[in-house]
Amino acid sequence: NESRRNADLMIIPESFSCIQKIVKLLKSTDTPYMIMGNGSNLIFRDEGYKGVIIKFGKPLSDIEVQDDIIVAMAGASLAEVANKALEHSLTGLEFASGIPGSVGGAVYMNAGAYDGEMGQVVIETLCLDSNGELVILRGDEHNFSYRHSRIQDDDLTCLQVKMKLQKGEKNKIQSKMNELNARRREKQPLNYPSAGSIFKRPPGSYAGMLVD
């Protein structure tokens, strides 16, 4: 995303406890703030953001694999998580290999493509509420639906995600990822800046045809 704007201040925290302290401080001083991941699905006003942006960066991007479970911090690249799944012959995240953005943002909006979405694999999230307190959501507590989750409704920030995948064959997983990425290149102008999708694809058709 190359649609860049300025903010009064940007903070890249190094730990979850650091985020908690920052949020509590900003709340106590009534300072406007927003928390963002990679910014892949955001558009700012021309004048930028009048407040503090807390950005998930490299310190909060760790990815761990435990058998068929992947635990990823919210700042991790979704594409990197998909590649980590491939590396360990885990299937279920092929759809995510070409989706830009962070894991936290993807879970927040239940990102998906090609009949796959985050709600199909997420089993637990560690979140931060608007008062700087930790909240854990499990299973159906996420209330996932099309591009929606309880994380939006409750004004939560996703800090860490636990995903359950299935053991598969690496060559088949790679083949599926290659196929989906080829379809993206064929239909989407990936060489241009983008603020994300706008239209929902109707059953049996696709948004581009209707717009045309």
Outline where the language-model segments fall:
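Generic structural signal for well-ordered, non-membrane alpha-helical segments
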Residues: 19, 74, 78, 118, ...
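Conserved beta-strand segments that form the floor/walls of ligand-binding pockets within enzyme
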Residues: 2, 71-73, 94, 108, ...
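A generic local secondary-structure boundary/capping motif
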Residues: 41-42, 82-85, 93-97, 110-117, ...
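Structural signature of FAD isoalloxazine-binding scaffolds in flavoprotein oxidoreductases
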Residues: 11-16, 43-61, 108-138, 153-160
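Hydrophobic, well-ordered secondary-structure segments
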Residues: 78, 82, 96, 100, ...
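Anion-binding (especially nucleotide phosphate/pyrophosphate-binding) glycine-rich loop
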Residues: 3-103
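Phosphate/pyrophosphate- and phosphate-bearing ligand-binding catalytic cores of soluble enzymes
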Residues: 42, 128-212
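Short clusters of hydrophobic/aromatic residues that line enzyme substrate/ligand-binding pockets
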Residues: 1, 63, 93, 107-109, ...
